[in-house]
Regions:
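Non-catalytic alpha-helical scaffolds and adjoining flexible linkers that form interface surfaces
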Residues: 1-180
């Protein structure tokens, strides 16, 4: 079977959809194809405004973080996919924080040695403050709220927010929104 050059270019520029159907409609009125039968892949939580807003804020950080890369590791897709599946099963902020810690660990930017980012001395206090990218600091150095060292250790080692209370999760959420 011979494929014309136009049809070949069409399939190159518009790949087949997940259902293995052609998603382009060829029109004799124009040289540009029209997309047909394209639907939004929905989630169970898509109609919940708070969950959707948190998802948009979280996924927008990935655009800013990955926009200049040429190739992407499948890790990023798998991370977002697993987060989207757990988004309505758990507190969405907890899912985002756990995913962010996994991202930092994958990229080698997770600072779990608890050395102050600002003064470069070891943090011996029980409360640790965090800055953007979850950089640890003394409460005195950063003048921000602290989080228990044992809870942060659990978060960084096991990627779990189980031992964080809701106020600490909200604090980490706002730090997360500062950027990846």
């Amino acid at each position: 079977m011979q494929i014309s050059g136009y049809t070949f270019r069409l399939f190159q520029s518009h790949p087949l959809a997940n259902t293995s159907k052609n998603i382009c409609d060829i029109s004799s009125k124009s040289t540009i194809c029209r997309l047909k039968d394209v639907i939004h892949i929905g989630f169970k939580w898509i109609n919940d405004y708070k969950l959707l807003k948190n998802w948009q804020d979280f996924s927008a950080l990935f655009y800013k973080h990955l926009k200049d890369t040429d190739t992407l590791d499948p890790f990023y897709f798998e991370l977002l996919d697993s987060a989207s599946q757990n988004w309505n099963k758990q507190n969405s902020k907890r899912v985002a924080i756990e995913s962010y810690v996994k991202l930092l660990a994958h990229e080698g930017r997770l600072h779990n040695e608890f050395e102050c980012f600002l003064c470069a001395s070891s943090i011996k206090e029980d409360d640790i403050s965090l800055l953007r990218a979850f950089l640890p600091t003394h409460k005195i150095c950063s003048h921000t709220f602290g989080i228990k060292k044992s809870s942060l250790n659990e978060l960084f080692q096991n990627k779990s927010t189980l031992f964080l209370n809701n106020n600490e999760v909200d604090r980490l959420w706002y730090i997360l929104l500062e950027g990846l």
